[in-house]
């Protein structure tokens, strides 16, 4: 199929709704000798609901444990493909930053060239939104690879350090990440679930904080940003109450480019700015694990 015919067919058919699963690569495979120029995706071709029910079965693919995760399809520049017997060789690099409910990937795309040595992963439960971010990363990687080495548009790392996966982070975080693996976790403009009976579906709860504390290393930072004051107070209350998190005064992070990106780089954050709305920020540091008392 010619390049033009393939592109036209994809636009007519719309984005694929297949689940990215555990081993989907942001870069689609090409036949030998074929060159396909990828288009920057347009959101209007990716229909999606504003929110998803996290308690239903979304036919998700996830590893039984972190060491079984094939990251080679997400970060081909850093991980080898599985061995012939299906076993996976763990590389030196590990995913260290996770954007939970990454939406259209604004934060990931902003941070990737600023911190090219950090592997970042967006976790998104909506199929079409995940597909959009997958296509966005693939198109951006290809565009970077085609630039001359001395181009002013060349970005450090070429976006090889960023990927996205369709996942329910409320259920499967420990399936993807080992204890203390993550350095940063972002919860940016999450679903507020206003009704009291829906509060159990909020992304920050006492039970879920235990999961996040497990995968976040001591000294790591958990970022929350929202335009809903009630949700901000809810998240801050539960984080303050958790024994493994300590509050970081926002003013101490005033010069932090990561927090600035968390506030402004996401599509939701930009919409709040256009509407001149408020943004509520709370960041917490993971404490050291308590030492076990010696038995007498």
From Swiss-Prot:
**Pfam annotation, one family:** Methyltransf_4
Methyltransferase listed as a keyword: yes
Which Gene Ontology BP terms does the record give? RNA (guanine-N7)-methylation; tRNA methylation
**Could you give a GO molecular-function term held by this entry?**
tRNA (guanine(46)-N7)-methyltransferase activity
Q: What class of enzyme is it?
A: transferase
Question: Would I find tRNA-binding among this entry's keywords?
Answer: yes
Disordered: where is this region? 1-26
EC number(s) on record? 2.1.1.33
According to its UniProt record, which residues of this chain constitute the active site?
191
Output the InterPro entries linked to this UniProt entry.
SAM-dependent_MTases_sf (IPR029063), Trm8_euk (IPR025763), tRNA_(Gua-N-7)_MeTrfase_Trmb (IPR003358)
The family database entries (Gene3D superfamilies) matched by this protein are listed as:
Vaccinia Virus protein VP39
Q: Give me the reactions it catalyses.
A: guanosine(46) in tRNA + S-adenosyl-L-methionine = N(7)-methylguanosine(46) in tRNA + S-adenosyl-L-homocysteine
Keywords from UniProt, A to Z, are: Methyltransferase, Nucleus, RNA-binding, S-adenosyl-L-methionine, Transferase, tRNA processing, tRNA-binding
Give GO cellular component annotations, separated by semicolons.
nucleus; tRNA (m7G46) methyltransferase complex; tRNA methyltransferase complex
Q: Where does S-adenosyl-L-methionine bind?
A: 101, 124-125, 168-169, 188, 266-268
Q: In which pathway does it act?
A: tRNA modification; N(7)-methylguanine-tRNA biosynthesis
The subcellular location is: Nucleus
Q: Which PROSITE patterns match?
A: SAM_MT_TRMB
- Stated role: Catalyzes the formation of N(7)-methylguanine at position 46 (m7G46) in tRNA.
Similarity section: Belongs to the class I-like SAM-binding methyltransferase superfamily. TrmB family.
Q: HAMAP family of this UniProt entry?
A: tRNA_methyltr_TrmB_euk
Query: How does it associate, per the subunit comment?
Result: Forms a complex with TRM82.
Kindly provide the name given to this protein in its UniProt entry: tRNA (guanine-N(7)-)-methyltransferase
Species in which this protein is naturally found: Cryptococcus neoformans var. neoformans serotype D (strain JEC21 / ATCC MYA-565) (Filobasidiella neoformans)
